[in-house]
Amino acid sequence: MTNSLRVAVLGGGSFGTAIANIIAANGHHTYLWMRDEDRAEKCQFERENPEYLPGYKLNDNLEITSDLVASVADADVVTLSVPSQSFREVARRVAPHIPENAIVLSTTKGIEGESFLLMSQILEQELGNVRIGVLSGPNFAKEIIQNQFTGSVIASEHDSVIQCIQQVFASKTFRIYANTDRYGVELGGALKNIYAIVTGMAAALGCGSNTQAMLLTRSLAEMTRLATALGANGMTFLGLAGVGDLILTCTSDLSRNYRVGYAIGKGESLAQVLDNIGQVAEGVNTVKIVKDKADEMGIYMPLVTGLHEVLFEGKDILEVVTGLMTGAMASDVDMQGGVQ
């Protein structure tokens, strides 16, 4: 590959737009695909994505299009940044058109419902024998496009993928770390969305710093417990894609999932909240999926269970909190295996 690569970013939401803008600013031939033709033409003409990132000028080198085939033609890197619910459909549509030697990257943080597959596993099914990577970490799109100092993780079993993605994305304000635990990095990004809803609820109820610290720590314990049972490396959850992403998402109202939790904590219904927020909050779907998997595997996840009771079983938040606080008290840390 030469220094200047051809990169396609599929998905014109906030994160897809932000990373496409970085790549274009780095001097690569960058194409941002949006599903809606009118939106794509408007963003291309106005040099702004007013629906998701209003007020931020897009790099002049960024080409915005609704032509999926043209966007990936001769691409060195194809990045999928679409919601998890439409991920497989987009992967299947684009599969025949991805160049043979292209690297395919997922930035989507979610889990497919019935299969419990992560996005890179869907890519393996739909695309066959391609080099795959996952980009994940504590990354708000708004701060990326503002050129705030940001760190992220590229995870792949292929050194060539890691090196290429670092070359494509890295800038003076965007630092890319490496990890070979693709499954763990991706699982961390999906699971933390659940706990952002929990901490948002706690904030709405007026809980203080003691509560926040307890929730963050116990959330990390639950994430790690499930992830290691599924085969991930527990050490991954001590890095940017684990505890880093958890802290960011659980402490800021820039997080859609945190805002969902906050609104529910203030008494709004789930349907009302999702309608008002106007964007996908992956954590809501992930709660159901993870609850079912934890029950199936016999994994102790009391925060997931409690949140499921509030969101989908009609239980009162304070009743659930009381149950969590008065339940059996386990050890804080297993000295052989980490946080319990």
Swiss-Prot record:
Pathway: Membrane lipid metabolism; glycerophospholipid metabolism. Its EC number is 1.1.1.94. GO terms for biological process: carbohydrate metabolic process; glycerol-3-phosphate biosynthetic process; glycerol-3-phosphate catabolic process; glycerophospholipid biosynthetic process. It catalyses: sn-glycerol 3-phosphate + NAD(+) = dihydroxyacetone phosphate + NADH + H(+); sn-glycerol 3-phosphate + NADP(+) = dihydroxyacetone phosphate + NADPH + H(+). Keywords: Cytoplasm, Lipid biosynthesis, Lipid metabolism, NAD, NADP, Nucleotide-binding, Oxidoreductase, Phospholipid biosynthesis, Phospholipid metabolism. It is found in: Cytoplasm. It comes from the Bacteria. Its main location: cytoplasm. Belongs to the NAD-dependent glycerol-3-phosphate dehydrogenase family. Sn-glycerol 3-phosphate binds at residues 109, 137, 192, 245, 255-257. It is an enzyme of class 1 (oxidoreductase). Catalyzes the reduction of the glycolytic intermediate dihydroxyacetone phosphate (DHAP) to sn-glycerol 3-phosphate (G3P), the key precursor for phospholipid synthesis. It holds the Pfam family NAD_Gly3P_dh_C. GO terms for molecular function: glycerol-3-phosphate dehydrogenase [NAD(P)+] activity; NAD binding. The active site is at residue 192. This is Glycerol-3-phosphate dehydrogenase [NAD(P)+].
